[in-house]
Amino acid sequence: MKVLVIIALCFFILQTALSEDKYESFESYVEDLKSGNMKGEARECIPLYNDCKEFKYNNNCCKDPEKKYQYKCSCIMCEGGEEQCTCQRKETVENMMKCVRFVKKVVEKVG
């Protein structure tokens, strides 16, 4: 039962994290994971207001003056080969990466 809840949570996080036009369904995302197509994944990028690419963790967008949350610079590869980075809450980035690793392990065991 716990596994189903974790998979459901991962599904929700992945669906919100992935662009809808890139992946129409979770099944296609899993197929890409199985085939290894995710390594050089490029996405269409949008203009950013909190770009942290140049400074990574030292950028002001990654600092919370009230020290309420920790932020982490999260990057994706754009279609033109350019990297785009934004600051996100550290917990969000780490939870998303845990879900991706979990889904990869499940796919390896099932596939």
From Swiss-Prot:
Please outline how this chain is modified post-translation: Contains 5 disulfide bonds.
Its principal location? Answer: secreted
Modification Valine amide, positions: 110
Which cysteine pairs make disulfide bonds?
A: 45-62, 52-73, 61-87, 75-85, 78-99
Instruction: Please state what the annotation says regarding this protein's domains.
Output: The presence of a 'disulfide through disulfide knot' structurally defines this protein as a knottin.
**GO cellular component terms, semicolon-separated:** extracellular region
Q: Which organism is it from?
A: Lachesana tarabaevi
Q: What is this protein called?
A: Latartoxin-2b
Propeptide positions: the record gives 20-43
Please state where this protein is localized.
Answer: Secreted
Q: Which family does it belong to?
A: Belongs to the neurotoxin 19 (CSTX) family. 11 (latartoxin) subfamily.
